[in-house]
């Protein structure tokens, strides 16, 4: 009998329309799903913060004429993966059909609603967090909502694709992507800033956060990617640095910021800066707006290397990961026996 497997590409999501009716729910869900994990905010304060964030973002993005494209890229990723998985008809002697959907924490269609839709029609669910660095604020949100939805039966029907940051093939994919997109200016001394979302290292009480903020994973991913770039024969970067994009509130944030990287580049005589947002899988306002503006304001000539987005090599690799997880779902016993034989 054919097994139907739902594949959910889940990420934060950014609004596409800069209206109050789109921005305010977005800001509210950020506070509800993320901020509430580290701070217990009274309802009136939460509403006020969401309002201020909405008004500030609407004003700033309109002034800059910035049009968010994250959701559009996410849909392209979903379409490309669905098309690629159409070629997979059978796994472990079981006929399969993939149902691929995009889902979001902060914009519609909300992740929990998509879970409701696919539960009735799918034999299993594969969750693909489109954020390569794991933390309680990234894939942790999806895992929490999934556990809340499926309860004790979650492990029978759900698989989560994880540890992208620690996957050698994924890191090699990033390295190739960088050098394929890079416009080499050998007459200049070029620095590479590997950009990611910043993380908390201490809470407001000066103590280590009780939740996993993803700091250790961010550093490990950066160090592995940097080493792989430096080993590559195509490498001509004079300097490679981590560029974290921090927020202002919530405690003490990591010190390896993009601002510090730019200051160190200046001291090293760097003449041009290349940005690659390694901490994201799709271009978003933190990468193609905020990071770009910070480099430009520092006075550097800039090359922006896009995220992996819907690049064919990335989609092919992701499809392989999905197929492996699907094998575990449709034939768990067969999969275990296969792994034992390999060992």
Regions found by a protein language model. Name each.
Residues 2-343:
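Active-site-proximal alpha-helix that buttresses catalytic centers in soluble enzyme cores
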